[in-house]
Amino acid sequence: MDRRDFLSLLAASTALPLVSRRARASGTALPKVVVVGAGVVGASCAWHLAARGCEVTVLEAHGVAAQASGHSFAWLNAGDGLQPMSYHLLRSLALGEHRRIAAHMPVPVLWNGSLEWRDAAHGAETLPEEVLRMRERGTEMHLLDVAGAAAIQPGLQVAPGTPLAWGAHDGALNGPATTRLLLEQAQSLGARLRMPVRVRDIASRSGGGVRITTDGDSIDADRVILAAGTGTTALAERAGFALPQKTKAGVIALTAPMPPVLRTVLYGPDVHMLQRGDGRVVLGEKDGPPAGPAHAERLASEPNAFPDPAIAAQHGERLLARASRYVPALAGARIEEVGIGWRPMPADGLPAIGFAPGSSAVYTAVMHSGMTLSALVGRLAAIEIADGTPVQLLADFRPGRFAAA
């Protein structure tokens, strides 16, 4: 996608209504939709579809925001400037969509920007180029020195001479609270939430639509959305198509509420941190656990918790110690919760959004970052499902691309 296409799609997308009544006004019957997955992406799809008048049922195997959405750093940003233009556009528009949703409900989001810095092992040499590319694409981003960064985050301790990227319009979302809020809003519009329910099979019906077999019963629907994060790969296989992923684990720790310390999202090479509106500081790391057979065996089932509270505490204190080197005011924080987040990510790193190959009933919505993209993806999925209108913004992200791999 070149810059002209980018600007054309940007103009067209901003003209789209938040909730379309086209299908209802034309007299066309609205589809009955099952959403598999009660994370932030599934919750956004459910709310947007329910707002259009669709009959919506959400099936969840574990709990609301129990998987990736409950263990996510939840930094809202437009990407890194090295990604395809179409993906950059999707993320950029999603930031605006979060603001639009916040006009309809009290979404717990803070728009305090972000500061990112790196070391040699994490791509420090490419950061200036990425900032330049982001600016060329229309994203407000600046390269700062240490003094400039300290004016934004007082007390920040980074090595002299370190360049930092300032993303002025980035934000931070409370993922679990946002997911619950979206589902509550969907339920107020008639959506149903069923859990714990495991999907055992997904099959096409001879007369059209799809039958979802669970561990307790079967549900007939016109459409099903697979939005189960890392679990979407197995669901896709049951539905008869391939959706490979390269999932990655990361430790997330939360402190007890504390007075305001962080004025922005801080994303360092070995730790990242943000402070929610409730005072809790979220700590995370980009690198996963060390490689080795012991870790591989323990992580094979993708657990969200550590096997021993003492091990969890060690990981939390490790992240806190790293964060405190950059922001000494965090040294007195108390770790309250530590978990493992599994990032859903299709094998080529790009979202997989749209109908499965050869199907008009099975729709996928799996991606990284779901926190950033969820607001827009829910809206666009509702347009495609309720209105039956393909959205050009999603053309590069169809799941059918894996069929030819």
Predicted feature locations:
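N-terminal export signals
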Residues: 2-25
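Flavin (FAD/FMN) cofactor-binding and adjacent substrate-gating region
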Residues: 7, 96, 107, 119-188, ...
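N-terminal Rossmann-like FAD-binding beta1-loop-alpha1 element of flavoenzymes
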Residues: 33-57
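Glycine-rich FAD pyrophosphate-binding loop
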Residues: 51-69
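Dinucleotide-binding Rossmann-like beta1-alpha1 core, especially the glycine-rich loop
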Residues: 73-152, 270-272, 280, 303, ...
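Central helical "cap/lid" subdomain
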Residues: 222-263
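Active-site lid/adjacent beta-loop-alpha segment flanking the redox-cofactor pocket in flavoenzymes
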Residues: 259-358
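C-terminal catalytic lobe of FAD-dependent flavoproteins
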Residues: 325-405
